[in-house]
Amino acid sequence: MKLICVFIVAVLLLTACQLNAADDSRDTQKHRALRSTTKLSMSKKDSCVPDGDSCLFSRIPCCGTCSSRSKSCVG
């Protein structure tokens, strides 16, 4: 029973701290954090295999196209 009471008090204390911190930081953040899905889509767009590198076993797409003859990326 004591353990449950300690747990409840701890949860209430942590919740109060979260609410207090949220009130203090309102409208002070200049650059808001991007969502993880946005970060993933941006990183996928930015990373590609450059021209001349092998595209045969690469998980990353070519910046241009993958040549079927040479199995390398072509711009």
Swiss-Prot record:
Signal peptide start and end residues: 1-21
Main localization (coarse): secreted
Disulfide linkage: C48-C63, C55-C66, C62-C73
Pfam families noted in UniProt: Conotoxin
Cross-referenced InterPro entries: Conotoxin
Domain of life of the native organism: Eukaryota
One Gene Ontology molecular-function label: toxin activity
Residues modified to Valine amide: V74
Propeptide: 22-45
Compartment(s): Secreted
Tissue spec: Expressed by the venom duct.
CC terms in the record's Gene Ontology section: extracellular region
Family: Belongs to the conotoxin O1 superfamily.
Entry text on domains: The presence of a 'disulfide through disulfide knot' structurally defines this protein as a knottin.
Name the UniProt record assigns to this protein: Conotoxin Bu6
